[in-house]
């Protein structure tokens, strides 16, 4: 039985060893004190034929060490060759170092998976790390969620789970845009449906109001609650009544839609509360900026090229955004005296900082790409650069069926709803496929393809990998009935396996893939890119399925060898490693890991 030599994941373990070698060389060679090793990395080489790992240590430290990169690489390589983990070290090119590890190291890493189960790769809470606030979805409460909202919702939810797995304290937030002109349009649209519910013939929906049938229940609820008394009121009197009812019903529907996708939020924060609360936080924030010289009365120059949003040729109150990296200063108050959306957003992010968040992440739709610089400038200003805002832009989703665009629904009027998609293909397919492409790339989502049972359908292929693993366990009990059914007991049982029996190159390759998981999670969390986990899971499932297929053709590679209990237990331990990692990664993505599939 093998034990993992370190609680670090394997790449971090080797990096620590490289750091120790550099520290020893620095002491022996009188390098400058405090030499910066933060840029030293240990990662898989681009070409697997170059070895198992590569480090840039010599390339990034040579200047400070006052040495030639190649000479420094040879010195580091000489000490690495004495390391118990390392079978071979090569210096390539101007000073890159490639390492090949002993095969037993990969089996030892499997021992760590058997110890940790689906917690393998989880990072302990980071002491002293700033609290993270992730704002995502934040769809206007003016209608049901559409398939475009779906991608941002899944991305934000998976990112939160990823960050929590990586040891961060995360709050999931939804910002309710309930204070702008669009909710007044919602109220007027709902009032039309209210009149319809009272028996009026309303005809075609006027341009500028929200079409579709989804506001009919709001109109019916208003009629049931108020009868016809709202009709006699002037707009200024009925509008807030209708608006509040419509917002409440739309938010209830949005929350139901999110629940269908298992999207969770800890906080639903109202934009209106910034203005209508006991303190007008927007006015307070503007005054805060004024005291620091970050707002002024001025006139913006005419836009060059593409129109600048909110530009008006008049003297107005401006935020000095250019002082914080933006391209142009930004208006805070409209000509009618109301606040710009940007002013409310500044107050919202200042409020987050006051609540103790210094690591802020906003998930924006593709149409908000031009909003990034101004928001990052605002966060710098209102937090004195003590908070950092990362904005992740989620690109459009093209909804297809067998390659053809999907028609819009009557209920929504001009879009396909999230609920329609989830009802047709299921939550797991939606969640996985929304993450199976980098967030800033347009996504083609084909309703027919995502339910195919083939390797061309990534969600099926990954889930089938987990189910296949459990199928192997069930079959193994026919010959080895002592193999436990319960997960924890099975992990403990398989920890006794002789993992050094895993020696075939295809088995070692699979073990190497398993060893990559903690590094994948760590790098995905640092980059705020959950798609990396989805890509990794597909690659892992592919290698697992390929090994199973080879065993069907080559009996000596089968997972279950009836007359060789030791080899079978080692291979079942490897299968358990695959099952545990697939379950862990799918949990981060919010996708079910089935034990069986039809």
From Swiss-Prot:
One GO term of the cellular component aspect?
Answer: cytoplasm
Say yes or no: keyword rRNA-binding present.
no
GO molecular function per UniProt: arginine-tRNA ligase activity; ATP binding
Q: Which GO terms describe its biological process?
A: arginyl-tRNA aminoacylation
Q: Where in the cell is it found?
A: Cytoplasm
Reaction(s) catalysed by this chain's protein: tRNA(Arg) + L-arginine + ATP = L-arginyl-tRNA(Arg) + AMP + diphosphate
Q: Which Pfam families does its entry note?
A: Arg_tRNA_synt_N, DALR_1, tRNA-synt_1d
What superkingdom heads the lineage?
Answer: Bacteria
Q: Where is this motif: 'HIGH' region?
A: 139-149
This entry's Enzyme Commission designation comes to 6.1.1.19
Q: What class of enzyme is it?
A: ligase
> Keywords, A to Z?
Aminoacyl-tRNA synthetase, ATP-binding, Cytoplasm, Ligase, Nucleotide-binding, Protein biosynthesis
Using the UniProt record, give the first listed, main subcellular location.
cytoplasm
Name the NCBIfam families on file. Answer: argS
Q: How does it assemble?
A: Monomer.
Protein family membership: Belongs to the class-I aminoacyl-tRNA synthetase family.
Tell me the protein's name: Arginine--tRNA ligase
Q: What organism does the UniProt record list as the source?
A: Bradyrhizobium sp. (strain BTAi1 / ATCC BAA-1182)
Gene name of this polypeptide: argS
